[in-house]
Design a protein with these regions (language model features):
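Acceptor/aglycone-binding surface of glycosyltransferases and processive sugar-polymer synthases
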Residues: 68-70, 74-84, 89, 98-173, ...
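Short loop->beta transition adjacent to catalytic acidic/histidine clusters or analogous donor-positioning motifs
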Residues: 3-6, 26-38, 47, 61-64
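A conserved acidic beta->alpha catalytic loop
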Residues: 41-50, 97-98
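N-proximal low-complexity "stem/linker" segments adjacent to membrane-targeting elements
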Residues: 1-27
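Donor nucleotide-sugar binding loop of glycosyltransferases
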Residues: 14-17, 44, 100
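Hydrophobic helical membrane-anchoring modules
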Residues: 174-259
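Conserved donor nucleotide-binding strand/loop of the catalytic core
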Residues: 34-36, 49-84
Length: 259
């Protein structure tokens, strides 16, 4: 029986790239491994959900599509997708094709003795100001959380590492910071970023500052947590809130979450 890899992708207004992304992931993962593709539509305002349904209908692979009842942000959507994953390994990448699916194989090959391998960002496909602020943010993240300074959300993780991350007692999620806070054995592998497949980045300057603030809150919240803090409550609430469909025909709609 082949090993299963779960590929988790947060989706926000990515209808133009989803079909190509799904094809490239399948060609990269199969047939060496069994693919579980998990797409999390984080309240897109375009037709991303419709495209996801079409991919699910046409795909021979196991595909799980989750639609959040409210916008969780990229990191919240990633953690929700990971909470549904069943693979021995999990890969996380963006839906805009800047994270090249073909790099997953190299990250897995470099994972011996590690819990997580980041795709160390290489290549400049953004303005100078955004490039410099991004470097500053990742340097701060590395100093506070202990992850590689070139780490981004594109990474592969062992099943046990995912469980450690989801068990962290934080209510302000910052996915990359949580990998560091869980004290996982992590490293980075240089990976060239591609040009954006379509559209433009949803990260305005204000939103990038908000992400940095959430990262700082996540780290401080964990460092100064009470000894009896609840484990995994936030992720459990998000998981219960979602609508999930897979290509077995199952539809689960638990309704709105308690807020």
């Amino acid at each position: 029986m082949t090993e299963t890899i779960s590929v988790v992708i947060p989706v926000f207004n990515n209808r133009a790239t989803l079909a190509e992304l799904g094809d490239r992931i399948r060609h990269t993962v199969e047939p060496q491994r069994t693919l579980e593709l998990i797409l999390v539509d984080d309240c897109s305002t375009d037709d991303s959900w419709t495209v996801m349904a079409e991919i699910m209908r046409d795909s021979p692979s196991r595909l799980v599509a989750i639609r959040t009842p409210r916008n969780l942000g990229q990191h919240g959507a990633i953690l929700l997708g990971l909470s549904r994953a069943r693979g021995a390994w999990c890969a996380v990448l963006d839906a805009d094709l800047q994270d090249r699916p073909e790099a997953i194989a190299g990250l897995l090959a470099a994972a011996a003795g590690c819990d997580a391998v980041f795709a160390g960002r290489r290549g400049r496909h953004q303005g100078l100001v955004r490039l410099l602020t991004g470097k500053l943010y990742r340097a701060l993240l590395g100093a506070l959380a202990g992850v590689p300074s070139d780490a981004g959300t594109f990474c592969v993780l062992r099943r046990e590492a995912v469980e450690c991350i989801l068990a962290l007692p934080v209510t302000t999620p910052s996915f990359i910071a949580m990998i560091g806070l869980a004290r996982l054995r992590a490293k980075s592998l240089p990976v060239e970023r591609a040009q954006r497949g379509a559209g433009h980045s949803a990260y305005s300057t204000g939103l990038r500052l908000a992400v940095a603030w959430r990262m700082l809150r996540c780290v401080l919240e964990y460092r100064f947590r009470p000894a009896d803090s609840a484990i995994g409550a936030t992720i459990g609430t998000w998981a219960a809130a979602s609508t999930m469909r897979d290509n077995s025909g199952a539809v689960v709609d638990p309704g709105e979450p308690p807020l």
